[in-house]
């Protein structure tokens, strides 16, 4: 059963705060991306692969993956054993060099983080950071 938006955010707020303390990524960014990318837990990758952030397989990924259609048909998306693995991996993705400019932003500056993540190529939608 899908959660409403507020229940979804409430369920994952504490872990997002923990990720903020550990990595400096605003909890609001983690929650917003998680909700947006997973359709608040209803997307097929979220339900079947515990992939709540739409993270695709890259050259360094050695874990399991599943095929889903996104920008193109049958793209490889990372598969996780549980939602916590997905959240942790999302934080690690945002610590990679393509998003290193974001690490200069305060955890309270969610606007700069959102724009920086978009500029780093996280999503293809023109208004992703809005």
Stretches found by the model and what they are:
Residues 1-130:
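Catalytic cores of secreted/periplasmic lytic hydrolases that degrade extracellular macromolecules
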């Amino acid at each position: 059963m899908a959660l409403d938006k507020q229940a979804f955010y409430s369920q994952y707020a504490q872990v997002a705060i923990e990720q903020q303390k550990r990595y400096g990524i605003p909890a609001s960014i983690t929650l917003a991306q998680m909700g947006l990318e997973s359709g608040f837990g209803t997307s097929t990758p979220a339900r079947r692969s515990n992939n709540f952030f739409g993270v695709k397989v890259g050259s360094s990924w050695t874990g399991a993956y599943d095929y889903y259609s996104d920008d193109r048909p049958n793209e490889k998306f990372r598969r996780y054993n549980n939602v916590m693995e997905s959240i942790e991996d999302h934080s690690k993705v945002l610590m990679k060099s393509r998003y290193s400019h974001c690490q200069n932003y305060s955890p309270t500056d969610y606007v700069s983080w959102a724009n920086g993540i978009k500029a780093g190529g996280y999503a293809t939608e023109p208004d992703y950071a809005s």
